[in-house]
UniProtKB/Swiss-Prot annotation:
GO biological process: cobalamin biosynthetic process
Catalytic residues (positions): 315 (proton acceptor)
Gene: cobT
SUPFAM superfamilies: Nicotinate mononucleotide:5,6-dimethylbenzimidazole phosphoribosyltransferase (CobT)
Enzyme Commission code(s) on record: 2.4.2.21
Reaction catalysed by this enzyme: 5,6-dimethylbenzimidazole + nicotinate beta-D-ribonucleotide = alpha-ribazole 5'-phosphate + nicotinate + H(+)
Pathway: Nucleoside biosynthesis; alpha-ribazole biosynthesis; alpha-ribazole from 5,6-dimethylbenzimidazole: step 1/2
Lineage: Bacteria, Bacillati, Bacillota, Clostridia, Eubacteriales
Name of the molecule in the record: Nicotinate-nucleotide--dimethylbenzimidazole phosphoribosyltransferase
Highest taxon above the source species: Bacteria
One Pfam family linked to the record: DBI_PRT
Keywords: Cobalamin biosynthesis, Glycosyltransferase, Transferase
């Protein structure tokens, strides 16, 4: 399934993008004055093939999984917070619930690897295993499990596409996943661990040093192949990262625009793009995470964040916030009058 899906990914549709540009230039405003909003509309048209794209049915996919590396003391939170917060998503009391409600978005909570029996009503049960192994002692998962987790993400997106979802956000929950994301991104960007590892949920200076040493140890021990993103994710990643990588791949194949959230989902996006570079055409950034590795990953992807609010909540909150920007971009493009409507002579570009 994975490799067939990768092969099916196409290019952006050029003709609708050209038609959108002509309409943008006809609107009663200085040429290009809507800035990046114009880029958003053109890319939406290129993805969907629609000259008047819609983003009225939104969803945030939250991949939830535990990470064995937590036993190394790299997190300020106990392991059981993963299952507790996952349940809280379904109770409607988390940050992403508040943001999603405000933007009229659904949230899709996926148990892809929580180390608990998640028999909650409303959860999508796609558990690969109850948590990964400790990357400081060996690989996080087998290659087969990594592919299985990626395919979970692909299938979730396909299901949402069949339901008419036309804008996706990505989120995650998993204690220890800033450590695994740091390890994966360190390898994929050929960086030093010191430049990629952050404080996560609020580590002390001493705990931060330990976290850096654990990331270095995991990479030295497992020797992931930077040219094989599946190998990297399987050796030093997590089920949430693999699942989110699958979401980006699935969105590209289904031609559904999809937003990165923060550091973890950006790392997953980078892994997906390394599997198939055309995946990038279907991805949008949302916000600049406060995690130090996030900037490096976004640079590797060639993206500039739309928002910079120094957030590091995760859960898909940055993506949900950026949904507002997409709503505004679509609204101004659809509803603004043309020069003809305004009885104003059209601007001509100055050469």
């Amino acid at each position: 399934m994975l490799f067939q899906t990768l092969k099916s990914i196409g290019e952006l549709y050029k003709e609708p993008m050209d038609m959108v540009q002509r309409r943008l230039d006809s609107l009663s405003k200085p040429l290009g004055s809507l800035g990046r909003l114009e880029d958003i509309i053109k890319k939406l048209a290129g993805i969907t093939g629609e000259v008047f794209p819609c983003v009225d049915k939104k969803a945030v996919i939250i991949m939830c999984a535990d990470n064995g590396v937590v036993e190394e003391g790299i997190s300020s939170c106990p392991k059981d917070v993963t299952s507790k917060v996952t349940r809280n998503f379904l109770k409607g009391i988390t940050a992403i619930n508040a943001f999603a409600k405000h933007t009229g978005s659904d949230i899709v909570v996926v148990d892809i690897g929580v180390d608990d029996d998640m028999d909650c009503e409303g959860i999508v049960k796609r558990k690969v295993r109850k948590g990964t192994w400790n990357i400081a002692k060996g690989p996080a998962m087998t290659r087969k499990e990594a592919i299985e987790a990626i395919e979970v993400g692909i299938s979730i997106v396909e299901e949402l596409g069949r339901k008419g979802v036309n804008l996706l956000g990505t989120g995650e929950m998993g204690i220890g996943n800033t450590t695994t994301s740091s390890a994966v991104s360190t390898v994929l960007t050929d960086s030093k661990a010191e430049n990629m590892v952050g404080r996560g949920a609020g580590l002390s200076d001493e705990a931060l040093k330990r976290k850096i040493s654990i990331v270095k140890k995991a990479i030295d021990l497992n020797r992931p192949d930077a040219n094989d993103p599946i190998d990297v994710v399987s050796k030093v990643g997590g089920f949430d990262i693999a699942g989110l990588a699958g979401c980006f791949i699935g969105a590209a194949a289904c031609r559904i625009p999809i937003l990165i959230d923060g550091f973890i989902s950006a790392t997953a996006a980078l892994a997906a793009v390394r599997m198939e570079p055309k995946v990038k055409n279907f991805i949008f950034p949302s916000h600049g995470s406060a995690e130090p590795g996030s900037k490096k990953v976004m640079e590797a992807l060639g993206f500039e964040p739309i928002l910079n609010l120094e957030m590091r909540v995760g859960e898909g909150t940055g993506a949900a916030l950026a949904f507002h920007i997409f709503d505004c971009a679509v609204s101004v493009y659809r509803n603004m009058g043309t020069f003809e409507d305004a009885c104003i002579e059209q601007y001509q570009p100055q050469v």
